[in-house]
Amino acid sequence: HMRDESKLPQVRFGTWVGGDRDGHPGVTAEVTAETLERLRANAFVVLRKQLVALSEKLSLSQWMQPLPQSLITAREKVAEALGERARAVLSTNTSEPWRQYVELLIERVPIEIVPHQVSQLRTGIGSYEIAEELAKDLASLRDSLTEVGAQRLADSDVRPVIRAVQVFGFHLAQLDIRQNSVFHAKALSQLMDAAGLDGSQWEEWAENERLRFLEKELRSPRPFLHASASAGPEADTVLGCYRVLAAHIARHGADGIGALIISMTRRLSDLLVVYVLAREAGLTRSLPEGLVCMLPVVPLFETLDDLEAAPSILGAFLEEPMTRRSLDFLSWNWGREKLPITQQVMVGYSDSNKDSGIFASQWGLQKAQARLAQLGRNAGVRIRFFHGRGGTVSRGAGPTHRFLEALPNNSLSGDIRLTEQGETIAQKFGHFVTATYNLELLLAGVAATTIEHERSVPMAPPLAPVLERLSRASQQAYRRLLDTEDFITFYRQATPIDALEHSRIGSRPSRRTGKPSLADLRAIPWVFSWIQSRFYVPGWFGAGSGLKALTEAELAEIGDQLRTWPFLYYVLTNIEASIASTDLELMNAYADMVEDPALRERFMKIILDEWNLTREMLEKLRGASMAERRPRMLRTLKLRADALRVLHLQEIHLLKKWRGLRKAGDEAAAEAMLPDLLLSINAIASGLRTTG
């Protein structure tokens, strides 16, 4: 089995750089088209490089090795496909047939490499169209080497290239397309208006009215408008993107495109709207049974309320005739093989944390995944969870093996999708050894957890009523802080959020719509600003109050479960790590920037009281202090403390000066010193090894 590539664990890469337009006006249809082309070109660059390296190793001579008929046949077949292009290759390396064969394969790769220039896609007679063609030609090479006894060459040199073709295909990474449900609603409203159907009040329609209209529309393949017609800015934006996807599928197949992800999925109609928009752009097919969508439609549940509603929304979605047809169509993998019927569901860790606090967020995610997995089993559909984790504890980060162990029972069935943030990519995959380690950790962890889940019986989590009460009390404490009058003033003055809003380090604007409200602020700058000021509020606040709300007997039960329930261990260990990363001296130094002393004292008392309570309750629960139990972690933090303190104090000095210039109306001077301020932010982020 180990020599059969199809039996090895499968790993695939995805991206939404160039595909994620949720709140990012710069990601246009043209950007998506260019992204798909660049991904395809770079896949060919990677594969060509591997083929060139392979050809250099295959110096077997036909005078020393018998030439198998299988290689002669394979070489003739490739040469015939290339036509005249094969002539130059066949005139070289005439006594090294294996090398010559690989040179023919290189000629079939449709990429033009020009030194010191961007590689260009090229088309020509005999060029590869699909990755399976290259994989098949490489399999012929491997088999011919095995035939002449060169098994080691086949295993050590050819198999890794076959594996690269399996992993990267001709697309390098699948591009996901993400857009907000509100944007889709506006697009549909404009389409309806343009078609004379009066969609101006679409967002005011009751849900049952929406569903009646959408289900009726999806029984017909007829679009609203001619392809050349314009319906409005949102409609044109969505349809422009979808038409790029449809054109790419028509030319190259769907391997390079992931899913249509709908952020802020709040109701069933948010998903069905996407089917109607896909029909308008030619992203559907009309089969005898009815319309099918050529790409998966994936809900993204982000807030605590949305996670609560997720099972009922997904259950209704899976009952929709178009959903069932589309899932069955996609399960045939474009005619290659029959795969299990699978519905992908994305769960977000950031917004639920920002709205409700760390414990309520984690418990809400745990419950939602368990219920969604059970719903899938009842419907005969495999649920593939896509975990939108960030680079910090408050946004779902943590040790990979602990994260996998903490997943709800029976929620992992052999495959999983995870996001990796920009700052963690360099840390985890910047070097060959660490990249290998982290990928192996993920593959082994998924395999082990899947086996564990298959052996276990689905059951309610232990202590569910106790954790429900803990979660509710922690959420109330967290919301009390955020809802306290003048909190936004304290937050904006005690953290560098205003400087972060002027930076260009994120992939999207810091606010969804530009409104200066807490609700409109994205989770990443929210977390980043608290980390920079060493409060780490999103990573621990509310946990102490939640634990304090329990009885002594309930606390003792939680203490016992810590040893046997990975979820509880994972969450409380991460909260403890956040508490350890705070710095009281620096918290006070940042708070000193708050102009109103009474306001400063009021909020610092709330935060420090909860900080002390959380430490106290964690020590009580664990039966020992952090210094006794986790000396290595504290030693690691201490090693960086002095250097970081200098950087923090410099940042505070620069922030005060920058804010003073802006307050005085000297925008030119403020703009001139912004690079120094952003440099200090970057230095602190590097020292802490995290942003948001």
Located regions from the model:
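Short, glycine/acidic-rich hinge or "gate" loops at secondary-structure transitions
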Residues: 61-69, 155-158, 288-291, 384-388, ...
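Catalytic or ion-translocation cores adjacent to nucleophile or general acid/base/metal-coordination motifs
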Residues: 27-58, 281-476
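Active-site cores of enzymes that catalyze phosphoryl transfer or operate on phosphate-rich substrates
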Residues: 97, 110, 174-175, 180-272, ...
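Often metal-dependent polyanion-binding catalytic scaffolds in large enzymes
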Residues: 1-215, 232-234, 258, 295, ...
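Acidic, glycine-enriched catalytic cores built around paired aspartates
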Residues: 87-90, 97, 171, 176-178, ...
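Generic recognition of flexible, low-complexity loop/linker segments
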Residues: 3-6, 14, 160-161, 245-250, ...
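Flexible, glycine/threonine-enriched loop-and-boundary segments that flank and lead into catalytic domains
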Residues: 2-4, 273-274, 392, 398-399, ...
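Conserved structured core elements
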Residues: 7-10, 41, 128, 132-135, ...
